[in-house]
């Protein structure tokens, strides 16, 4: 027997073994595909469509199109919406087969569900079933992901708690107890049932975040710049130069206008930092579109 013949005689059984394995795998794949088709026929199905900026939460291939979800057991429309990665706090209107529903609506076989974000220029208060009751005044809670934004919002005069050391459970509890709006970059935090008001901040740059939030909540007319302590959020009080003189650097003692935080005793005056922050607020206001003419 030649060397080639000897090799061939040993190789052929091995080759036939691989062929058998390949055939078995192909059969297994066909079986799995057929089984999946059979299950899809037996299971219920509903179609979902997300509009406008809600597509930010979807993968590129799922944006702007109908998405079919198969299910064997029903669930609330809130659960289905969040299974796509969209927090319920981002949703302002849900239509099931063309009719407004709330988040507890049980999704059924054949349902066509349309999910909309906040409407900027259209009043849908008489239609929506998912929007929480309006707040008398907007108060915010920010987590560790948006710390610089917390300082900017306080600088603009808004009541802002900054939970940089708080757990997710603590943050959700504060939102529910104090009726605050949660601002975060963590979409899954917004999916907690206790969080009924919140917003997922898209931008990662703090100044753009400030502009984004001012636009989203229409805050331009509510700004009260330099009225809150940047450290502890307390409202500032006017202070005479004499009352704070000992706390001032020598080059600041010729200033006339001072504010004092009654809580942490920090003193504020109109220096270079004040001018930079004023410039930032002017930039924000200049980049907020004017309201539509009625």
Give residue ranges: language-model regions:
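Low-acidity, Ser/Thr- and Arg-rich intrinsically disordered low-complexity segments
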Residues: 2-10, 28, 255
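Short cysteine-rich clusters marking metal-coordination/redox-active sites
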Residues: 229-232, 261-264
